[in-house]
Amino acid sequence: MDAGSKKEDFLLLEDEKFDFDLSLSSSSTNEDDEVFFGPVGHKERCIAASLDLNRRVPGQPLAPGSGSPCTLSPLTGEKFVEVYKEAHLLALQIESHSRREVAQAATPQNPVNQGKETFVQDSQLKVSLFEKEQKRDRSPMSLKRETFCLPSSRVQPPMGEPQLLASPGLLSSPVSAGPAQTQSNQGLPCSSQPLPRESSTSQPPSQAGPQKRITSKLQPPRALPVRGRNLHLATEKLKKEVPASIQRTKLVNEKGSQSDVLQDKPSTAPDAASREGHPGKRSLPIPGKLGLKKTLLKPPGYTGNLTRKSSTSGSASSLESGVYRSSVAGKAKSSEQRSSIPASGSQRRTSTSKSGRIGPAASRQALPAAPARVFGRQANKADAAQTVAEQPKVPTLSPLTQQPQTPEQRGPRLDPDTETPQLNKTVSIKRRDSYLSCKTEAVSTTTNPFKVPQFSVGESPGGVTPKFSRTHRLQSWTPASRVVSSTPVRRSSGTTPQGLPGSMRTPLSTRRMSVLPTPASRRLSSLPLMAPQSMPRALVSPLCVPARRLSSEPRRRSTVRAELTQESSGSGSGGQAQGLSSDESSSPPSSVPQALNFSPEKSASPPPQGSSTGAAQGEAEPPEDTLPSEVHGGGCSHTPSEGLLLDLKLDQLTITPEAGGRDLADCPLIDFSNTPESNTALGPSSWPLIDLIMNTPDMGRNDVGKPAKAELGQLIDLGSPLIQLSPEADKENVDSPLLKF
């Protein structure tokens, strides 16, 4: 029964784990960290203790008389206590871990979720606030645009403008007055020079008055930016004081008569008619853009722009009213005044560009046949040409009368030079030189590439041919003078000019003719200057001497060009008989695969006879290894020493293989199809660097393979591995592998 009771006690001990938790909780909490580490260790220890107890249970009834406490106290009692402690610790740890997990799962997730929720709410609020701010920003912009377009509804010119300009106190008096009062106002600053502030307040309205009257014809909604501009000028004049005001009075006195002349030529009746009728025809955003550009691009403290704008806009209005000569005279006067102003080049450039912007805007209606963009560039060029053209008194009426006609002659074809910003300053000087030189020569030689296509535009009545054909003639000169960069087929195909000796084409002008728009054939022919395909193209035929020379040295271009021009002049009759220009004489399709022919033995065949025979082509074809100067020596024998200095032989261009081996062009780096028989038959020069078939492990590494491998001297031998795992090959692994298994 005791044993049964003990067994029941054992069973009760397993059930009493939860009962001892309350009593031993303090001690178990102290020994938590010392005794136990993980739940797996607890289970294993508990199982071991239970097994030990079960083994010792039958030994306990041997001493039943001693009593159960005696038997429990020495050994079994300690074990029971240990079992109890372990059970308590297990229960405590399991409960504590479960509670901690529950607490950690409950507590940290709630604040994180709360923070995320609050953050999302805040972000949504911020986004809504930004949207509200954007809506607030958009609404006044739309209101401003509506107010900006409002003056178009009240366009009655005599009544509308005083209403627009009555708000600033500065502009009320001069606008109501006519041009007679503007003269008196312009005369005022001379008397008020010791008072610069009064002159600064009275001077901008006097300048803005005529400008207001004239720009209202073109752009009625210009009231607000001009108003802000006058205030800006007044503040800057307060800063600059006396010397700036004196200089401005001189400018105003010089240009007062000019603006009055431009305003008095068209009568007041066409002014009113153009005021009333023009804003209906013209769209509003274009004048607004012009006004904004002028306010932004105005240099600080430079008030001459106002009178210039008034004069140019006055000439534009006179164009619309039908008086065309007055606009020419106004532009001429404005250009003269512009050239005499003591200002920097940048200010003069901005003034010419501004006048060029207003000029085509008005004259575009007079010439609707020409495209708008082309004529804008052309008129901008014309104003730039007038500024310098009137200083040496070269006749300026010829470009003024011819340039509106040149867009009709040549259509939308414009050189890319007109788009460069340098032409506002440089083209006018070159144009003046072209006026002086077009009387003597048909085409004068210059060092600047921009000047060549512009002569035909402004030539005096001697040049009758339109620019379209003349630019083609300029392009057709280049294959005769730039034969150096062309293929041998096109060497003598371009027609040389009939009455021009070779001295008139200097190397610089003809070399830089590539700035012009070139046809596709010449574009392809000029590529081998920098492309790596020029070396195989040199191997096509012995007639490709100039391309070889370009690859040898660029310093010899001038001498070769001088020689080739004489040859082309000698062979010009054959080229002219065919009548091939640079656009028509494209290289035949047979020359394209020849450029990629790498074998020098097959290139000794004669080239296709697509071009006329010149002086150099009439010679016998020399072998491939001859010098290029020998090929060229028949055409020009006066400079053989210069040709011999920097020439490259063909054997330097190609690496000559050995006599017994194959050509190196056919020798691959990695050859997958070589057999040892073919490799031994061929010389060692044609062995591949890596051979994947001869040195495979399948081929036995016997005495036959190793001397062949020594003869080859290959870089990588994939047949002998560094690590070999087969135990059968241990005898052979003594030499090659690093590790054995």
From Swiss-Prot:
**In what ranges is there compositional bias, type Low complexity?**
310-321, 360-372, 478-497, 578-593
Disordered: annotated segments: 101-120, 131-428, 450-512, 550-640
Q: Induction: what does the entry report?
A: By p53 when exposed to different DNA damaging agents, including gamma irradiation and chemotherapeutic drugs.
PTM sites of type Phosphoserine: 73, 139, 153, 191, 245, 311, 460, 476, 493, 509, 514, 521, 541, 582, 599, 720, 726, 736
Cysteine disulfide links: none
Localization in the cell = Cytoplasm, Cytoskeleton
**Protein known as:** G2 and S phase-expressed protein 1
What species is this protein from?
Mus musculus (Mouse)
Please name the gene that encodes this protein.
Answer: Gtse1
